[in-house]
A protein has these predicted regions:
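Positively charged n-region of N-terminal signal peptides that target proteins for export
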Residues: 1-5, 20
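Sec-dependent N-terminal signal peptides
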Residues: 5-13
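N-terminal post-signal-peptidase region of extra-cytosolic proteins
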Residues: 51-69, 74-75, 96-120, 139-144, ...
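Short Gly/aromatic-enriched secondary-structure transition segments
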Residues: 85-98
Length: 208
C-alpha cells in the first residue's frame, strides 16, 4: 500500500478516537465525592469563666481568719469575705429583701441597701439566731432619701434563719427566694463562720 495512504488512514483513526465524548460521572457520584472530601470543623464549646462571686450549688466556702471586708453582690445573691491581703476567706449564699432591685431609699420599701458601710454591732437574736448590724443609712443614703422627702429607715443586718430552720433542713428553700424586709439572710452555719471572722473594723460593701 502506498505509504502516504497508510499515514492518512492512521491520522483519520487518531482523529476519530480523540473526538469521542468524555463520559461524565452521574451527579450523585460527584456529590458523594465532594462530601467525602469536606472536613467539618466543629468549634469547641467554651464555658463562661466563673469569677469569685459566681455562686454554684453547694459551693459555700468556710475558712478561719479575720475579715477586712465583706463584699455583697446582690445580683448574684452572694456575700464574700476577704482578708486584708484581698484573699477570699469564705463565700456564702444569701437572700435579700422582698424587693431586691435597686438601692434602699425609704423605711418599709423592703429593699436591700447599696453602698459602703461598716459593722456597728454583733449580737445574738432570739428570732434570727445571730445578726450583724451595719451602718445603714450612710451619708449618701441620708441625702438621697432627704431629696425624696422620705425616711431612709435603718436596722439593716446580716442575719441567719428563723427558728424552724435553725438546723438548716430548709436552707435550700429559704435561699431560693428573697424574703427579708431588707436585710441579708444566710444559713446558720454560714453565720457562725462570719461571726468568728468579723469585727467593728470590717468594711461592708454592697454592690448592685
Amino acid at each position: 500500500m502506498n505509504k502516504k495512504i497508510v499515514l492518512l488512514l492512521i491520522g483519520i483513526a487518531v482523529f476519530i478516537g480523540c473526538g469521542k465524548k468524555v463520559k461524565v460521572p452521574p451527579k450523585e457520584d460527584i456529590n458523594k465525592t465532594v462530601e467525602q472530601n469536606i472536613t467539618i470543623m466543629e468549634e469547641p464549646i467554651v464555658e463562661p469563666e466563673l469569677d469569685i462571686f459566681d455562686w454554684q450549688q453547694n459551693d459555700e466556702v468556710f475558712s478561719e481568719g479575720i475579715a477586712n471586708k465583706i463584699v455583697v453582690v446582690k445580683s448574684k445573691r452572694v456575700a464574700v469575705l476577704f482578708d486584708e491581703d484581698g484573699n477570699m476567706l469564705s463565700r456564702h449564699r444569701i437572700s435579700l429583701g422582698e424587693h431586691p432591685v435597686g438601692a434602699k431609699r425609704e423605711a418599709g420599701d423592703k429593699k436591700t441597701p447599696e453602698g459602703v458601710y461598716h459593722i456597728v454591732d454583733i449580737r445574738r437574736d432570739p428570732k434570727y439566731y445571730k445578726e450583724i448590724l451595719i451602718s445603714y443609712p450612710n451619708r449618701e443614703d441620708i441625702e438621697a432619701s432627704k431629696a425624696l422627702g422620705v425616711n431612709p429607715g435603718g436596722g439593716i443586718t446580716f442575719h441567719s434563719q428563723v427558728p424552724w430552720n435553725w438546723d438548716g433542713h430548709g436552707d435550700d428553700y429559704t435561699l431560693s427566694h428573697d424574703w427579708t424586709i431588707g436585710c441579708m439572710a444566710m444559713t446558720n452555719k454560714g453565720m457562725d463562720n462570719v461571726w468568728d471572722s468579723v469585727n467593728t473594723d470590717t468594711i461592708v460593701e454592697i454592690r448592685e
